[in-house]
Design a protein with these regions (language model features):
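Conserved catalytic/switch belt of AAA+ P-loop NTPases
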Residues: 111-152
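AAA+/P-loop NTPase substrate/partner-engagement loops
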Residues: 66-98
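An amphipathic alpha-helix signature
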Residues: 25, 166-174, 189-193
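Pre-Walker A (pre-P-loop) alpha-helix and adjacent loop at the N terminus of AAA/AAA+ ATPase modules
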Residues: 3-44
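C-terminal alpha-helical "lid" subdomain
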Residues: 176-183, 190-253
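Conserved alpha-helical scaffold flanking the Walker A/P-loop in AAA+ ATPase domains
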Residues: 86-125
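A short helix-turn-beta junction within AAA+ P-loop NTPase domains corresponding to the substrate/partner-engaging
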Residues: 146-164
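Walker A/P-loop
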Residues: 43-76, 155
Length: 253
């Protein structure tokens, strides 16, 4: 199975990651069945697991967008909530507000047993294709699935967001800057590799969030470049042929 070109565009940040397209195809197939059949299928809810800052919520929202296009469903509200807050809510009342839509539960490992049981029962009664996405680290996901067996059975689809290689982080940075109307030139890419190497730690992977912050900082520097910016405007080097603003090596130093 492969994603369409349009779907690849929606998942542009993640497609360069080895094995991600296959994971997404499998997950979309299972979740589509849940969305279309509702309580007629016991599974089809989704787990997205990975480290902090790896883009889990970004991936969740992209999956929802693709599902809306593929199925014409997910026409209810889409909500996002931290598990510790959800534990204190009237879960049945909240569920009724997102019927036919989706609820993204962040830090899902913090769900209480009572919350897990309640959500499981609500999913069993649901007729409108409401589905849930659990987000957490692998440890947090293991923790929440141990709370209630019936709840765990509802989550048959999983996407693992792996540790990004430096090349994949650079690919993300390029895609992110492109969406904002910028282009990272070749010398700037080398400077970005250098910035990434400086923040890498032995016991913790560099995250998409950290790389996003580096690009945001470069964009801010470009926008307030003073004399250098004035010269680049005069020499017409500030824009690409498709009118994107060029980020240079200096912007990343």
């Amino acid at each position: 199975m492969k994603l369409t070109e349009e779907e690849k565009g929606i998942f542009t940040y993640f497609i360069p990651v080895k094995g991600m397209e296959e994971q997404l195809c499998k997950a979309l197939t299972g979740v589509s069945e849940r969305v279309e059949k509702g309580s007629e299928t016991c599974g089809g809810n989704l787990i997205i697991q990975g480290g902090q800052g790896c883009g889990k919520t970004m991936l969740s929202t992209s999956i929802i967008k693709v599902l809306q296009q593929k199925t014409g469903k997910v026409d209810g509200r889409v909500g996002k909530i931290d598990a510790t807050i959800l534990n204190k809510k009237d879960i049945a009342s909240m569920f009724s507000k997102i019927e036919g839509g989706c609820l993204i539960i962040e830090r899902a490992g913090e769900l209480t047993k009572n919350a897990a049981v309640t959500l499981s029962l609500l999913l069993e009664k649901d007729k409108k294709g409401t589905f849930l996405i659990l987000e957490d680290s692998p440890k947090g996901i293991k923790k929440v699935l141990s709370k209630d067996e019936n709840f765990a059975k509802k989550f048959t689809e999983t996407v693992d967001v792996p540790i990004f290689t430096n090349d994949e982080l650079i690919s993300f940075a390029r895609s992110y800057s492109r969406e904002l109307g910028y282009k990272i030139d070749d010398m700037a890419v080398l400077a970005l590799y250098n910035r990434i190497s400086k923040i890498q730690r032995l016991n913790q992977a560099t995250t998409l969030t950290e790389v996003k912050e580096i690009v945001d900082e470069a964009i801010d520097r470009e926008a307030h470049g003073g004399l250098r910016k004035a010269i680049s405007i005069l020499t017409a080097k500030r824009y690409t042929d498709d009118d994107r603003i060029v980020l240079t090596e200096k912007d990343f130093e």
